Amino acid sequence: MKVVLIGDSIRMGYQPIVIKKLPAVDVWGPVQNCRHSVWAHDRCKEWVIDEEPDLVHVNFGIHDSVLLPDGEHQILLPQYRLSVRRFISKVRDDAKAKMIWATTTPLYASDPDLPMAQWPIKDVSRISDYNAAALEIVQSEGVPVNDLHDVIVRNDFTKCLQEDGCHMTDFGNEVLSDAVAEAIEGQMR
């Protein structure tokens, strides 16, 4: 079975551990950060279709929900909804692969005056809005959900998140890799 992992820097943190946990599975992911939904959709042929996967595990949303320093949204919620729908269609129609959708992990601002992950302005509550929008779509499409947001919350997000309030500690990557490996194994049955 071939699995492609698509996602931002959060995926890049757990990917090497998932590969070690699933030695009988051909797990691959792009070397680069897949950033946001529009970026991933535009590179779907290179990152997904050309790899001919049986299963795609998708994890993006942080970059989509970012408020840029000028106060503009990186990807507005209506555009995000459209990108999620288009990505699902492209994977199903062109790659003929099954998919798992992973919710976006939480953000945490221990000091609201400090920048998070190099972005000076980020509203941590926006993750919930983007997760809700994606869940409405993927559930209506019958795509299984891997709730990585809940995994981090249940495992004490202050232990899972680095000081930047976005990226994972070693412990955070470990718990995410467990959840991703389990979700993949669940689709292999």
Residue ranges of predicted features:
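Histidine-centered active-site loop/cap adjacent to the catalytic His
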Residues: 40, 44, 132, 144, ...
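Short, well-ordered beta-to-alpha junction loops that form the rim of enzyme active sites
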Residues: 103-106, 148-150
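Short glycine-enriched, charge-decorated loop/helix-capping segments at active-site entrances
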Residues: 70-77, 116-123, 161-163
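Substrate-gating cap/lid alpha-helix
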Residues: 109-148
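A short helix->loop->beta-strand "cap" motif at the edges of active sites that frequently abuts
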Residues: 93-99, 143
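Conserved SGNH/GDSL esterase-like catalytic core that processes O-acyl groups on lipids
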Residues: 1-86, 90
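Non-membrane alpha-helical structural segments and their capping/turn regions in soluble enzymes
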Residues: 74-85, 124-128, 132, 170, ...
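Short acidic/His/Gly/Ser-rich catalytic and metal-binding motifs that mark active-site loops
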Residues: 65-68, 108-113, 153-158
